[in-house]
């Protein structure tokens, strides 16, 4: 879904059929279009984004923090642990916003998804993860809007009480 959301192309076109497909996309995407028009890009995100839009494979020692790279995502702070706290993630995003001044900034959380897989939809842990992310967004939203950003918030593609998305996920 990450590839489709940021490229606007269907799965059969970009070829990312599961999270296990290790590939750097070679089609237009939000990051490349921003750069094509003179903008700067940044991501505080799961390492998949670095692989999808910059290069493969992700190397913890070299790729975790990338500032002012020459790749599709100019600056990134990437994590690989599904339970990476949203408090850290949003701090990473704010660091990038304040210090790199991107025209397009992606902040991608895995915390809600992680709790959903571990405890299922409707669980106390899942609902708490949603609330934590909601509070952080509510606190940061005025700063982002005052800085001239347009905000788009997307959500996961659903999860059931057993912690499964459906499809090929388990």
Predicted regions and their residues:
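Feature captures the catalytic ectodomains and active-site-proximal regions of enzymes
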Residues: 1-170
């Amino acid at each position: 879904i990450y590839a489709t959301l940021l490229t606007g192309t269907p799965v059969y076109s970009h070829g990312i059929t599961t999270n296990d497909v290790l590939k750097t996309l070679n089609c237009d995407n939000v990051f490349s279009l921003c750069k094509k028009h003179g903008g700067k890009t940044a991501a505080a995100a799961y390492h998949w984004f670095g692989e999808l839009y910059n290069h493969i494979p992700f190397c913890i020692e070299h790729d975790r923090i990338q500032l002012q790279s020459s790749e599709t995502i100019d600056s990134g702070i990437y994590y690989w642990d599904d339970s990476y706290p949203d408090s850290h993630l949003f701090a990473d995003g704010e660091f990038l916003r304040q210090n790199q001044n991107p025209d397009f900034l992606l902040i991608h959380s895995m915390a809600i998804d992680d709790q959903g897989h571990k405890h299922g939809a409707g669980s106390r842990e899942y609902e708490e993860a949603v609330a934590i992310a909601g509070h952080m967004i509510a606190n940061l939203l005025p700063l982002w809007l005052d800085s001239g950003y347009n905000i788009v918030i997307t959500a996961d593609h659903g999860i059931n009480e057993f912690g499964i998305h459906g499809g090929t996920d388990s």
